[in-house]
Amino acid sequence: MFQDIGPYVFHNEYSSRKPEEDDILIVQKGRDILMNCGQTLPTVAQVRAVCSLAAEQAYYLLSIDEKHFFCTDVQVPETENLSYTSVMILREMNPGYMGFGGSVSWQLASWYDLHRYCGRCGTKTEHSERERAIICPKCGHTYYPRISPVVIIAIVDGDRILLTRYNRGGYRRHSLVAGFVEIGETLEDAVRREVMEEVGLHVKDIRYCESQPWPFSSSLIAGFFADVDGDPTVHLNTDGQDELAEGVWVSRDELVLEDSGMSLTWDMIRKFKEKHPISTIA
């Protein structure tokens, strides 16, 4: 999957290290990220040549082996060799470890950008010098990176799996039922609620499969398998806010793997097709 970058080693522990010229410098602008014309992430030296202030005000994010990633709050203008493009391009970047490192760096850079001012008192915030955190110098409130829990569910009816297709957005391939965990819910509660809300089914024998960090939505996704409990007829949500355009049962023999396996969704679908055992936990 996307985060499987071995033999490279991902280091997300905080460090106060300073940038060097060949380190990677992440510059984000909303859902876009600054890239070289060759679709590689720019170095500190390359950004410095365009905007020296951006390089001087860079701060450390993470490392993969000896490749260090930094970001800056300073907006860098586009040039003939540097331009902003959708962060989703990192999903298919080669080598894959750079795509993963770049996307997690974009996630952190976006979080820093959203917390430039204290949400409690409005004072300009500061970076902690002891941990990855943002501190308000006036009221003392501390902010930590946001991670939103998500569940994704492979709903099974014997030799069939339920595939869905989103009603909106750019992703047009089949997917699985998924959604954010609400306050006060267990992961298992979220599984039952999302399945009922989106496809009108009851499920049983909920069993954990695996998880995946997904930087593009600042999420940690927990994947579950669950069996249909009762009538398998799909009833898509029609309250005017329906997320799904389609929900269809597909047999194991008919199942075609549409994705490269970068996402948890298609890793779970592959496991179903190949009959991987998933133990019951709830």
What positions do the PLM features span?
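Unchanged
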Residues: 53-92, 181-282
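N-terminal strand-loop-strand
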Residues: 28-29, 133-176, 180, 202-203, ...
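A generic structural signal for well-ordered coil/turn residues at beta-strand boundaries
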Residues: 114, 149, 157-158, 170, ...
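Residue-level detector of short, conserved catalytic/binding motifs and their immediate flanks
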Residues: 22-24, 151, 222
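Cys/His-rich short segments
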Residues: 103-154
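N-terminal alpha-helical interaction blocks
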Residues: 1-96, 277-282
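Short, well-ordered strand-loop elements centered on a beta-strand within folded domains, enriched
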Residues: 32-36, 67-73, 160-165, 176, ...
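Short, charged surface segments at domain edges that flank catalytic/cofactor-binding sites
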Residues: 92-103, 107
